[in-house]
Amino acid sequence: MNDKTIWITGASTGIGRALAIKFAKNGWNVAASARRENLLKELEELNQDIYSFPLDVTDKEKCKEVFKKIEDKFKTIDISFFSTGTWDPGKEKEIDVEQIENVMKVNFFGTLNCIKSVEKYYRYKKSGHISIVSSIAGYRGLPNSTGYGPSKSALNNLAESLFFDFKRYGVRVSLISPGFIKT
């Protein structure tokens, strides 16, 4: 095993998957989490330094359990990269409160569940990095984004607040807001 470890949520596709591959190639232990276990297994087969930890981020207790398993396996987590997200533009042609609640549950509360699971660890460790993936959709309204945009806007505000809360413990918090990525 390597000296450095990164935990990546949303690791089965897109930015999370690409990052998992890159960090593993650079000699890091990669704890890869996502809902789709079959895609995690495919990712795991690409590099011996990628380890799958299936997770539905909307389950608070499961987030805590998965974090504990990662900590037990690697003993240290240097970076937590939370890139879980969902968007279904086909369902946003009309305001659908249930669909918006689901997007908020995954994008905002799912990320918050993961942050809560690492909070005490990083505060005690007094070092580390929490990275939150948002979107340009969090800065201005876009068509068919009645759920997605507000969920990312909430992440922006959360990251900005956590920046100050964790800074006093020597823990970095960063916000990444990419444009559209074909996944």
What are these regions (language model features)?
Residues 12-13:
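Conserved glycine-rich cofactor-binding loop
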Residues 26-42:
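Conserved glycine-rich Rossmann-like NAD(P)H-binding loop of the short-chain dehydrogenase/reductase
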Residues 91-92, 96-104:
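Substrate-binding pocket helix/loop in short-chain dehydrogenase/reductase
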Residues 115, 151:
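Active-site helix of classical SDR
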Residues 120, 164-165:
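Alpha-helical segment proximal to the catalytic Tyr-Lys
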Residues 135:
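Residue(s) in the substrate-gating loop at a strand-loop-helix junction
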